[in-house]
Amino acid sequence: MSRTNFETLLEAGCHFGHLKRKWNPAMAPYIFMERNGIHIIDLHKTVVKIDEAAEAIKQIAKQGKRVLFVATKKQAKEVVAEKASSVNMPYVTERWPGGMLTNFPTIRKAVKKMANIDKLMSDGTYSNLSKREILQISRQRAKLEKNLGSIADLTRLPAALFVIDVCKEHIAVREAQRLGIPVFGIVDTNSDPNCVDYIIPANDDSNKSVEVILNAICGAIAEGLEERKAEKVDTEAAGESAEGEAAAKAPRKRGGKARAEKAAPAEAQPAAEEATEAAAE
């Protein structure tokens, strides 16, 4: 069953592309027609591509891996932050930090610096600093929070990127390609689909369009996380059951051995008596 449908996408305006003069010829297979100088996206193909991307991203989440959402354009910032947070995934909605992926250790150092500042505030050291130092540190903390706060929990490279506008986020896409990280993306008629592993042809300039697609994608991630959780519970239950069976069998073995040991002297007693009588004769 599809995660969305033609009518829902149509109502959200997912079919509106860019002006014909701005189109990328590589998007031709996903364009249905031209109307008033604007390309119209084939939503039947969009439905299929959403399902393909959702299934792939579900498997990534099921393995316990992270998906990094990237959307620095104004129309998509809020909805991406909301949807990514709902499934506990990291996101970047401010300026993309150059080297975020290719120079990840440096980014992690900046995140740790933010944690160290928080520690200063909590352990009382902060109050011993001068007003000027406190102001400088506070500004630095605010800047780090703005740019890196949403990826503070990202301790290793993400397993995938989900990009809202591959044209605008070309630096992030290029870094992911260099590292072999799969890219999922909403691709409008002015973008190149060849730089994306899982393309979702749709309007990337509309808040409603982005929200409808993210509902399907984040729904798939939530399913993957739930299935992972259920499998973990089943595995633990199976382990406890196996331990219980082993414990139940162990006493019976010891009891059987004890009974055998008790029976042995009883059987040996008549034999000893017979031997004594024979010796007396």
List where the protein language model places each region.
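N-terminal cationic and glycine-rich segments that engage phosphates or anionic surfaces
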Residues: 1-66, 72-73, 77-120, 131-134, ...
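Residue-level signature of catalytic and energy-coupling elements of molecular machines
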Residues: 13, 69, 161, 213
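Short, ordered loop/turn segments at secondary-structure junctions
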Residues: 14, 45, 72-75, 94-101, ...
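Short hydrophobic alpha-helical runs that function as membrane-insertion/retention elements
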Residues: 67-68, 90-93, 162, 182-186, ...
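Extended, charged alpha-helical interaction scaffolds
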Residues: 131-163, 167-184, 188
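Short glycine/threonine-rich loop/turn motifs
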Residues: 171-234
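Long, low-complexity, intrinsically disordered segments
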Residues: 267-281
